[in-house]
Amino acid sequence: MARIALIGTGMLGSGMVRHFLKSGTEVTVWNRTEEKARALAAEGATVAASPAAAVSGASRVHFVLPDDAIVDGILDRIAPALTDGVVVVDHSTTLPEGTAKRAERLRARGIRFLHAPVFMSPQMAADGAGLMLASGPQREFDEVRAALEGMTGEVWYLGARPDLAAAYKLFGNCMLFAISGGLADVVTMARANGIDPVDAMSVFTKFQAGNIIHGRGPRMARGEVTPASFAVAMARKDVALMIAAAKDQPLVAMPCVAKRMDEVIAAGGAGMDIAALGPARATAK
C-alpha cells in the first residue's frame, strides 16, 4: 500500500489525517509539538521522530503549517529525504510572494511542488468537504488531482502560476474577516439599543447582504464609480448613524470604513458610488 506523509497535525492537519485513515490510506505524521501527533497514533497514524523520517519513502507529502518561515524551514529539513519525483503539496496559508519564490527555489532543486490551500474547517477536513485551491505546474496537479479531489468537495485549479492559490486564499479570508468585523458591529449596536443580538441577526434572513460581492464587487474591480446607486456621501451619513447607535461602545469595522469614506469625499468623490471605496485608480464611466 502506498504511504503518504503529512507534516503539521494541528486542528486542520489532524482532520486531514483522519480523513486519510478513514479511506484506508497509510499515513506517517510529524508535528513540532509531538503530543499533537501522538494523539493520532491511536487512530492508526504512524508518528515519525523527525520530518525527514516522515517523508522518507512516502509517495506523496502534505504540509499544513502556520506560516512561510516554518514551511521553508521544514522543506530544508526534508529535502534530502524526499523520494525522487514525489510531489510536495502545501496546504498552508502563505504569502503569495513567498510562495512564488519558494516554488522557484524548489524547482531549481528538482523538488516538485504544488500549493493547495483550503477553505475548510477541521471537521470538514475530516469529512472530505470544503473547497481546495491549487496552483503550480499542470503536470504535478494532474498527477495528484484524484488524491486531492478525494480530500475535499471541490478542487479549483487556478493555473501554473505558483502564487495564485496563495493570493486567492487571502482574497477569501479577507472577506471572511471583513464580514466578521461587520457582524461584530451589528452585535455591538444591538446590545447598545436593548436588542438581543440573536434577534438582530434575523435581518440577514431577509436582507441578503452577500449580494454586494456579486453586484458591487465587479464594479469596484473595474473602477466604475458612476452612476451611483448608493453615493458615498449618503453612505457616510449611515455610517455616522451606526457609530452613534453604538453609544460610545467601540466598533470593529465602521471606523475604518468611515475613514476611507472621508478620504474619498475629500478627493471629490461624494457623489460617486460606494464602489469608489476601492483603490484611487478608479475612474468614472
Segments (PLM) and residue ranges:
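NAD(P)+-binding Rossmann beta1-loop-alpha1 motif at the extreme N-terminus of oxidoreductases
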Residues: 1-63, 86
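Rossmann-fold dinucleotide-binding core
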Residues: 4, 93-174
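Amphipathic alpha-helical hairpins
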Residues: 15, 53, 60, 66, ...
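Hydrophobic residues within alpha-helices
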Residues: 16-17, 36, 102, 147, ...
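Hydrophobic beta-strand scaffold residues
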Residues: 27, 47, 113-114, 155, ...
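Rossmann-fold NAD(P) dinucleotide-binding segment
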Residues: 51-112
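Helical "substrate-binding/catalytic lid" subdomain
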Residues: 164-281
